[in-house]
Protein backbone atom coordinates (compact mmCIF):
# COMPACT_ATOMS: atom_id res chain seq x y z
CA UNK A 1 0.00 0.00 0.00
CA UNK A 2 1.03 3.57 -0.71
CA UNK A 3 1.65 5.71 2.40
CA UNK A 4 -0.03 9.12 2.27
CA UNK A 5 1.76 11.70 4.39
CA UNK A 6 0.29 15.04 3.34
CA UNK A 7 -2.91 16.75 2.26
CA UNK A 8 -1.87 17.06 -1.40
CA UNK A 9 -1.45 13.30 -1.72
CA UNK A 10 -4.83 12.75 -0.07
CA UNK A 11 -6.55 15.28 -2.35
CA UNK A 12 -4.90 13.68 -5.41
CA UNK A 13 -6.45 10.33 -4.46
CA UNK A 14 -9.89 11.86 -3.82
CA UNK A 15 -9.82 13.63 -7.21
CA UNK A 16 -9.26 10.23 -8.83
CA UNK A 17 -12.21 8.68 -6.97
CA UNK A 18 -10.14 6.74 -4.43
CA UNK A 19 -10.94 7.10 -0.76
CA UNK A 20 -7.85 6.51 1.39
CA UNK A 21 -9.94 6.70 4.59
CA UNK A 22 -11.48 3.35 3.57
CA UNK A 23 -9.22 1.84 0.88
CA UNK A 24 -6.76 -0.13 3.00
CA UNK A 25 -5.70 -2.37 0.14
CA UNK A 26 -4.11 0.50 -1.78
CA UNK A 27 -3.39 3.16 0.83
CA UNK A 28 -2.07 3.74 4.32
CA UNK A 29 -2.32 7.18 5.88
CA UNK A 30 -0.07 8.87 8.38
CA UNK A 31 -2.17 8.85 11.55
CA UNK A 32 -1.82 12.62 12.06
CA UNK A 33 -3.15 13.25 8.54
CA UNK A 34 -6.00 10.76 9.09
CA UNK A 35 -7.08 12.44 12.35
CA UNK A 36 -6.85 15.92 10.80
CA UNK A 37 -9.12 14.91 7.90
CA UNK A 38 -11.56 13.06 10.17
CA UNK A 39 -11.90 16.16 12.37
CA UNK A 40 -12.53 18.34 9.32
CA UNK A 41 -15.17 16.01 7.91
CA UNK A 42 -17.00 15.05 11.09
CA UNK A 43 -15.97 17.37 13.93
CA UNK A 44 -14.19 16.83 17.22
CA UNK A 45 -15.75 13.74 18.74
CA UNK A 46 -13.44 13.69 21.77
CA UNK A 47 -13.60 17.33 22.84
CA UNK A 48 -17.17 18.30 21.87
CA UNK A 49 -20.21 18.15 24.12
CA UNK A 50 -23.87 17.17 23.80
CA UNK A 51 -25.43 18.33 20.55
CA UNK A 52 -22.00 18.83 18.95
CA UNK A 53 -21.13 15.17 19.44
CA UNK A 54 -24.56 14.06 18.24
CA UNK A 55 -24.23 16.19 15.09
CA UNK A 56 -20.68 14.91 14.48
CA UNK A 57 -21.85 11.31 14.92
CA UNK A 58 -24.71 11.84 12.46
CA UNK A 59 -22.34 13.35 9.86
CA UNK A 60 -19.97 10.43 10.38
CA UNK A 61 -22.64 7.70 10.13
CA UNK A 62 -24.13 9.23 6.98
CA UNK A 63 -20.66 9.53 5.42
CA UNK A 64 -19.92 5.86 6.18
CA UNK A 65 -23.31 4.84 4.74
CA UNK A 66 -22.57 6.81 1.55
CA UNK A 67 -19.12 5.26 1.12
CA UNK A 68 -19.62 1.60 2.09
CA UNK A 69 -21.78 -1.08 0.44
CA UNK A 70 -25.33 -1.27 1.81
CA UNK A 71 -25.19 -4.88 2.97
CA UNK A 72 -24.51 -6.59 6.26
CA UNK A 73 -20.83 -7.52 6.39
CA UNK A 74 -21.71 -10.64 8.40
CA UNK A 75 -24.66 -12.22 6.54
CA UNK A 76 -24.49 -10.12 3.32
CA UNK A 77 -28.19 -9.24 3.59
CA UNK A 78 -28.99 -6.07 1.61
CA UNK A 79 -29.86 -3.05 3.75
CA UNK A 80 -32.29 -0.74 2.03
CA UNK A 81 -32.52 2.62 3.79
CA UNK A 82 -30.05 4.50 5.96
CA UNK A 83 -30.14 3.94 9.70
CA UNK A 84 -27.38 4.76 12.17
CA UNK A 85 -28.14 1.36 13.74
CA UNK A 86 -26.42 -0.27 10.73
CA UNK A 87 -23.12 1.44 11.66
CA UNK A 88 -21.47 -0.77 14.25
CA UNK A 89 -18.26 0.32 15.96
CA UNK A 90 -15.65 -2.42 16.18
CA UNK A 91 -14.07 -0.69 19.20
CA UNK A 92 -16.66 1.15 21.29
CA UNK A 93 -16.88 4.93 21.30
CA UNK A 94 -16.83 5.01 25.09
CA UNK A 95 -13.62 3.02 25.49
CA UNK A 96 -11.85 4.48 22.43
CA UNK A 97 -13.28 7.97 21.77
CA UNK A 98 -10.27 8.94 19.66
CA UNK A 99 -11.29 6.22 17.14
CA UNK A 100 -15.02 7.01 17.17
CA UNK A 101 -14.90 8.75 13.77
CA UNK A 102 -12.39 6.47 12.08
CA UNK A 103 -14.24 4.77 9.19
CA UNK A 104 -12.03 1.69 9.59
CA UNK A 105 -13.65 1.22 13.01
CA UNK A 106 -17.09 0.61 11.49
CA UNK A 107 -18.82 -2.51 10.20
CA UNK A 108 -22.08 -2.17 8.31
CA UNK A 109 -24.28 -4.74 10.07
CA UNK A 110 -27.97 -5.58 10.12
CA UNK A 111 -29.67 -5.06 13.48
CA UNK A 112 -29.37 -8.75 14.40
CA UNK A 113 -25.61 -8.92 13.76
CA UNK A 114 -24.99 -5.49 15.30
CA UNK A 115 -26.53 -6.94 18.48
CA UNK A 116 -24.38 -10.07 18.13
CA UNK A 117 -21.21 -7.97 17.86
CA UNK A 118 -22.17 -5.84 20.87
CA UNK A 119 -23.61 -8.51 23.16
CA UNK A 120 -23.02 -11.96 21.67
CA UNK A 121 -20.10 -14.29 21.02
CA UNK A 122 -17.97 -12.25 18.62
CA UNK A 123 -15.54 -15.12 18.07
CA UNK A 124 -18.18 -17.08 16.12
CA UNK A 125 -18.83 -14.26 13.68
CA UNK A 126 -17.45 -14.30 10.13
CA UNK A 127 -16.10 -10.75 10.55
CA UNK A 128 -14.20 -11.59 13.75
CA UNK A 129 -10.71 -12.31 12.34
CA UNK A 130 -10.73 -9.24 10.07
CA UNK A 131 -11.91 -7.07 12.94
CA UNK A 132 -9.13 -8.39 15.18
CA UNK A 133 -6.54 -7.39 12.57
CA UNK A 134 -8.17 -3.96 12.27
CA UNK A 135 -8.17 -3.52 16.06
CA UNK A 136 -4.45 -4.27 16.22
CA UNK A 137 -3.70 -1.87 13.35
CA UNK A 138 -5.77 0.98 14.82
CA UNK A 139 -4.46 0.55 18.37
CA UNK A 140 -0.87 0.66 17.10
CA UNK A 141 -1.49 3.73 14.94
CA UNK A 142 -3.31 5.69 17.65
CA UNK A 143 -0.65 4.73 20.21
CA UNK A 144 1.94 6.25 17.85
CA UNK A 145 -0.18 9.42 17.62
CA UNK A 146 0.11 9.91 21.39
CA UNK A 147 3.92 9.84 21.15
CA UNK A 148 4.04 12.99 18.97
Describe the residue ranges of each PLM region.
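Short, charged surface segments at domain edges that flank catalytic/cofactor-binding sites
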Residues: 17, 23-74, 97-100
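Short, cysteine/histidine-rich loop/knuckle motifs that typically chelate Zn2+
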Residues: 73-76, 112
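Histidine-centered nuclease catalytic patch
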Residues: 76-108
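Charged phosphate-binding loop/patch that engages nucleotide di/tri-phosphates or the phosphate backbone
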Residues: 130-148
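Short Cys/His-centered divalent metal-binding micro-motifs
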Residues: 80, 106-129
